[in-house]
Amino acid sequence: MKELVYLIYAAVFFYAAAVFFMIMKKNRGAYFSIAAGFIVYSAFIALRGWLSGFFTTYGIFEGVFFMPWVMGFIVIFLSAYSKDKEDALTAVIPLFCFSLFAAFYPKGIIPPTPNKLTIWADLFFITEPFGHACFYLGGWYAALSIVKKRKTADYHSLLVWGFVFFSISQVTGAVWAFLGWGSPFRWGARHFQSAVIWCYYAAYLHIRFLKGWTDLRKMLYAASGAVVVALCTFGSHLKEMGFPRIGG
């Protein structure tokens, strides 16, 4: 358990260093600090799979911890291959914030129930954080575009990919819910929150075809989406902090 704590703290330290280098316009230092943090964070994620005494994917793909890993992967990719590398690096700020939240979150895993021991649950827990990470980063780059009064990193592509991943998570989640509870949809907060997120971004994909929707309006809508996702997910995260856990 101590090893996990040291690893995630080290990753957060590297991300904090990357923020410093980015502010100081030391882009090379920022990039390598992000890469170092990502490597350490990957080790943290891998070790979580063994917290219960035997390997379980649920320890790896818990959203609070897996989503920053996905975000780190995307930021590294964009910082290396995007046309706007300097703008892409600014996303280390939300990466640092989400990793810091994970560092202070209970590190143990919630004991997996029988209805979670299915490939459909794994597919859901993998694709949903990918969707959330794309939504957050797309919102960040949209907000950056508003501040700089020009389109920065391609926030639209991130939101499209986020919608694809999130839609897959809803389908796999529905299959998992049917196998585990006998219904593809449960009348609970978790499912309604997912419905809100899906409808919000489904609307985003269509408003760009409406007359009168300027680029600024689209950016504002895209940036606001990150707030919608946060409001719909952090309630569940805070609630689950009180759940009994294995390993701390």
Give the role of each language-model region.
Residues 2-109, 126-180, 189-248:
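Hydrophobic cores of alpha-helical transmembrane segments in multi-pass integral membrane proteins
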Residues 117-127:
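Surface-exposed beta-loop interaction hotspot
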